[in-house]
Design a protein with these regions (language model features):
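Local sequence-structure signature of Cys/Sec-based thiol-disulfide redox active-site neighborhoods
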Residues: 1-36
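Acidic-residue sensor for enzyme active/binding pockets
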Residues: 11, 37, 62, 75
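Conserved residues at beta->alpha junctions
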Residues: 15, 41, 67
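Short alpha-helical
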Residues: 19, 45, 71
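Thioredoxin-like thiol-disulfide oxidoreductase module
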Residues: 39-57, 82-84, 88
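Structural micro-motif
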Residues: 54-64, 73-74
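Non-catalytic, surface beta->alpha helical segment in thiol-disulfide oxidoreductase systems
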Residues: 65-92
């Protein structure tokens, strides 16, 4: 049996060498949630870009689920724990 989350897509703002960012991406993957990564400092995105999107952001990761702002890794864990009650099971 394969489980699939009712959440469809995530956006993860991250930086290299960030253990919490790696943890967030692993958690999303374990829930079957695809994500786009916005890597700060890798040439495409800057800290300014993140602040424009999340004015109070002072750390990474910053995470959006289905276009709604969630917060960092602790908030993601809480959100997925709540949504885990609604996971559906696909019969194989």
């Amino acid at each position: 049996m394969q489980t699939k989350s009712p959440l469809n897509k995530a956006e993860v703002w991250s930086q290299t060498n960030c253990p919490a960012c790696q943890g967030a991406k692993r958690l999303l993957t374990s829930f079957g949630i695809e994500y786009d990564e916005c890597m700060i400092g890798a040439g495409t995105y800057t800290k300014k870009d993140l602040i424009e999107k999340v004015p109070n952001a002072r750390s990474v990761p910053q995470i959006f689920l289905d276009g709604q702002y969630v917060g960092g890794l602790p908030e993601l864990k809480m959100r997925l724990a709540i949504n885990d009650n609604y996971k559906t099971t696909t019969l194989g």
